[in-house]
């Protein structure tokens, strides 16, 4: 089967689960923004930002290590060793958090709600254990089972949210309880994979995996700094503390409006990581990586234009308390930032294939330094608009750095000029939209024109590939 077709088919299956799941999850945004004030939603936004850090910490790069070592060692032994490692670390983590939940909740400013911390400890622990079984499904190309469990998780989460918030009219604590129920059911659904494990812990293999994975952990933590630190710092750095929680809630809601691009990136990564490793030994592997990058970028810029053109319709998903004039600019900046993040993920294959994962850590730390310095500088001046600019500058800088460093270690013939052309045309269209007050449907002609433009340039290659 044509490698690009295989990647496309796998992405479609993973994408179906992510699209259906995320769209169902997306329904929670209008729910939350209609039942909770921005200050209340700010609590949800902040706590989930911390969760993102802790999930990375608790999986410590073992998913990617599992993919790498499954190609070199006996897959059953690799899975068993990884599963036992994650089980032990997760149990220890949950126990420590429960013992210190009161102190942690007081430190975060939620001293009356230590149960929030306990709920999240259980969620994070179960999700960390589940992650390796999901990785096993991906490694075995069991995309349908992967998709089914992912969608079930979201359906359960959304269902309990609707029951607790709409029917029972409970408070925000029940958002976390709904998530906890979903995590429990997901773990139960993955029991067949876990029970099929040989339950053998290979200490020598584990050490090798940890050496490979630890730089990825550092990269992951630095990456989470880039993705979520703005929502952690925002309420602490705003000069007007009276509106800090409300501003955080607004920013969290606007961040959700960029979900379509984040969704595609996540979907692509589920399929692409095992695909890239599988193509490593192929003679034309590097050419395939270059083609994937180009077509990935095309899809990303189309998503960018689609969301910005139809923003007025999309913002209707938010409650009236969340309609703010800063929304369009912030969402546009975040979309562009995520576009560069997606390109960076494509580029990052060079240090994974060459086992120079320390460079992933270096690049992420480089990005984290930019993110932290810009957030501390821009938030007091621009509020959450400064958060968005910091994210864009960070991801753009990481992309450029990864490209030039990667050229020296693992040269891939990326079509840089063609990709740059598409980005330039996209930005020209965006500025036409931003600085004019044309009707949304008239603006959509720009999108149609861009698609035709791309098709005319790529048609010979598409015909050849397909």
Residue ranges and their predicted role:
Residues 69-85, 250-364:
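Specific pore-lining/lateral-gate transmembrane helices of multi-pass inner-membrane transport
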Residues 2-63, 87-100, 123, 154-158, ...:
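Signature of the first transmembrane helix
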Residues 1-26, 67, 77-80, 84, ...:
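N-terminal membrane topogenesis motif
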């Amino acid at each position: 089967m044509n490698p690009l077709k295989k990647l496309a088919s796998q992405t479609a299956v993973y994408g179906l689960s992510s699209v259906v799941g995320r769209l169902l999850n997306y329904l929670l945004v209008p729910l939350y923004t209609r039942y909770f004030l921005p200050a209340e939603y700010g609590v949800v936004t902040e706590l989930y930002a911390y969760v993102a850090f802790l999930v990375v910490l608790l999986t410590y790069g073992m998913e990617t290590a599992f993919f790498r070592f499954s190609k070199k060692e006996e897959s059953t032994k690799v899975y068993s060793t990884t599963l036992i490692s994650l089980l032990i670390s997760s149990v220890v983590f949950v126990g420590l958090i429960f013992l210190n939940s009161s102190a942690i909740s007081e430190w975060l400013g939620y001293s009356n709600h230590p149960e929030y911390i306990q709920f999240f400890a259980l969620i994070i622990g179960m999700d960390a254990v589940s992650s390796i079984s999901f990785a096993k499904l991906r490694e075995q190309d069991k995309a349908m089972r992967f998709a089914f469990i992912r969608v079930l998780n979201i359906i359960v989460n959304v269902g309990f949210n609707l029951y607790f918030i709409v029917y029972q009219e409970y408070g925000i604590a029940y958002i976390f309880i709904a998530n906890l129920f979903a995590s429990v059911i997901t773990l139960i659904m993955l029991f067949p994979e876990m029970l099929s494990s040989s339950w053998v812990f290979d200490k020598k293999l584990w050490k090798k995996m940890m050496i490979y994975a630890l730089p990825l952990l550092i990269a992951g933590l630095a990456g989470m700094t880039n993705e979520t630190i703005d929502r952690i710092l925002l309420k602490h750095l705003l000069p007007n503390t009276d509106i800090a929680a409300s501003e955080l809630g607004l920013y969290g809601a606007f961040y959700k409006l960029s979900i379509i691009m984040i969704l595609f990136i996540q979907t692509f990564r589920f399929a692409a990581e095992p695909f890239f490793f599988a193509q490593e030994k192929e003679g034309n592997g590097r050419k395939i990586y270059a083609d994937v990058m180009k077509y990935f970028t095309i899809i990303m810029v189309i998503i960018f234009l689609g969301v910005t053109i139809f923003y007025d319709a999309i913002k209707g998903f938010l409650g009236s308390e969340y309609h703010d004039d800063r929304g369009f600019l912030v969402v546009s900046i975040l979309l562009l930032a995520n576009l560069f993040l997606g390109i960076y993920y494509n580029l990052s294959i060079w240090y994974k294939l060459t086992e120079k994962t320390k460079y992933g850590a270096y690049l992420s730390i480089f990005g984290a330094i930019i993110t932290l310095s810009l957030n501390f500088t821009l938030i007091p001046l621009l509020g959450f608009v400064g958060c968005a600019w910091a994210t864009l500058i960070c991801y753009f800088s990481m992309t450029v750095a990864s490209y030039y460093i990667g050229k020296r270690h693992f040269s891939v013939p990326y079509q840089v000029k063609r990709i740059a052309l598409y980005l330039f045309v996209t930005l020209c269209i965006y500025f036409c939209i931003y600085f004019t007050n044309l009707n949304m449907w008239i603006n959509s002609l720009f999108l149609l024109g861009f698609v035709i433009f791309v098709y005319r340039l790529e048609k010979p290659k598409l015909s050849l590939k397909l």
